[in-house]
Design a protein with these regions (language model features):
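Short, acidic/polar N-cap/turn motifs at the starts of alpha helices
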Residues: 17, 29-33, 40-41, 121, ...
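A general structural signal for short secondary-structure junctions and capping/turn motifs
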Residues: 9-10, 33, 123-125, 250-252, ...
Length: 301
């Protein structure tokens, strides 16, 4: 009698726009090593403020650009001089486009790197107070844009209330979960199966649920609007009881592990952020739902 090891179904690395950092986590002249898309990378911001995501290994002798040794190193990362990142090993300098622009001890630029793009870089955009990188396994240019949300970029809404998880699953599992209303009753304890109106426009998916929501003061008509643009960027807007906007971001670390970021914002009342009560309860409920989904995702095949 033989036994057979059951392995998780192999799913490819998805392509799209993915969050690699919150904007306020990366100051000018800072850098850090990151690992996304099953690759070692370095994320840095130039002195002028441009965010850059680049292959991590110097083409000279393979030093990691994201691990610096000098006082002028970025926080936990490589040294930034002007717009360039500097290799900690022999101080080769690389532009935001991945071109070697200086070998300080050489009279002439080595032919291997002269006038060439030596390191792969990723298309970057910043909106919703997030740094987004475009990943495609074949290096294709972006096929759609990151959706900018007025709420996420407005001072009339609260600062982001952020939550983060590392989950051993694949982005497709999470996408399928969002389109599976039947599990809400059994996993999340809802009284019934939610019904959604869904529209599709290329990579953009939008959903709408309108319902009467019970409150201590009686029923209140409310709505939940959802949307996504590819596997990396999703949003949910709750209206009715406690207006809440959720920016949900899923970024593949490798083929079996993702980083999930939730950023909640709520409208200010007379310039102030209303805390506690229903406002806090709705956020706790959503975070709790992810915690309920997590063990199922992590142990699926």
């Amino acid at each position: 009698m033989t036994s057979q090891t059951i392995k998780r179904y192999p799913m490819p690395m998805p392509f799209g726009w993915f969050a690699v950092s919150y904007s306020d986590e990366l100051a000018p002249s800072e850098s850090r090593a990151v690992h996304y898309f099953d690759q070692e990378l370095v994320l840095f911001r130039t002195e002028a403020g441009k965010a850059v995501l680049m292959e991590a290994y110097c083409p000279h002798l393979g030093a990691h650009l994201g691990h610096g040794i000098h006082e002028r190193s970025g926080t936990g990362g490589g040294r930034i001089e002007g717009n360039n990142i500097v290799c900690p090993f022999h101080s080769w300098k690389f532009s935001p486009e991945g071109e070697c622009v200086e070998v300080p001890y050489a009279k002439n630029m080595p032919p291997k790197v002269a006038g060439k793009k030596c390191l792969k870089t990723f298309p970057i955009t910043e909106t919703n107070k997030v740094i987004w990188a475009w990943y495609h396994p074949d290096g294709a240019a972006p096929l759609w844009d990151v959706i900018s949300h007025d709420e996420a970029n407005s001072d009339d809404w609260s600062p982001q209330d952020r939550y983060e998880w590392i989950i051993h699953t694949h982005p497709q599992e999470m996408a399928e979960n969002a389109a599976d209303p039947a599990h809400f009753k059994y996993v999340h304890g809802t009284a019934s199966f939610p019904e959604w109106e869904t529209t599709y426009d290329g990579p953009i998916v939008r959903g709408l649920q309108v319902a009467n929501m019970p409150t201590p003061r009686g029923e209140v008509k409310g709505s939940i609007r959802t949307g996504s643009a590819g596997p990396g960027q999703g949003f949910t807007k709750f209206e009715g009881i406690a207006d809440t906007f959720l920016l949900g971001m899923t970024t593949p670390i490798d083929e079996h592990k993702v980083q999930v970021r939730f950023a909640f914002i709520q409208p200010k009342v007379h310039g102030e952020v209303k805390k506690g009560g229903v406002n806090s309860a709705i956020i706790s409920n959503i975070v709790g739902q992810l915690e309920e989904d997590k063990p199922i995702w992590e142990h699926k095949i």
